Amino acid sequence: MPHPLLPDLETLASATAAGKGYKLCCVQVFTHLIPMTIQVQIRRKDGSDVSLDDCAHFSASMDEALEASQLFTEAYVLEISSPGIGDQLHSDQDFLTFRGFPVEISFRDHDSDLHQAGLLHKRSDEHVHINIKGRIQRIPRKAVTCVRLTNPTG
């Protein structure tokens, strides 16, 4: 059953996207997650690719619009993406932009390929830091083979 506020949320997201040069693709509300997750997918009006920076900028605008609308009184996580957007983080800006987002880190440890999932905390010169159930784990950058955004909804 769709969330009762989904039509209002779609209207708000569509207006916010249009004002920033994007068009709305999809809005989903996942109430089974704690906190609730609101996923918004956007595309550029001109058809060009949406970058990670575009998602971050739109996230700020959408968050302001949500707060001003007072549609939701409970806590929520806002996720902005685009169909087909690249999910690997490479640049320092990527790591700053997606601080706090769910990630999976692939790395090598003593000839084994390992994976850790958590919330991106930061990347320093020596380590990638992720929050796993409230504890910060440091993974040496030399060992990291890939850091990619994940979707907490599965």
UniProtKB/Swiss-Prot annotation:
Cell compartments where the protein resides: Cytoplasm
Gene3D superfamilies, per the entry: RimP-like superfamily, N-terminal
Entry GO CC: cytosol
GO biological process, one term: ribosomal small subunit assembly
Coiled-coil segments: none
Disulfide bonds: none
Keyword Zinc tagged: no
Record-linked Pfam families: RimP_N (PF02576)
UniProtKB keywords: Cytoplasm, Ribosome biogenesis
Protein role: Required for maturation of 30S ribosomal subunits.
NCBIfam families assigned to the protein according to its UniProt record, in alphabetical order: PRK14634.1 (NF011227)
Membership in a protein family: Belongs to the RimP family.
Protein name: Ribosome maturation factor RimP
Protein's organism: Prochlorococcus marinus (strain MIT 9313)
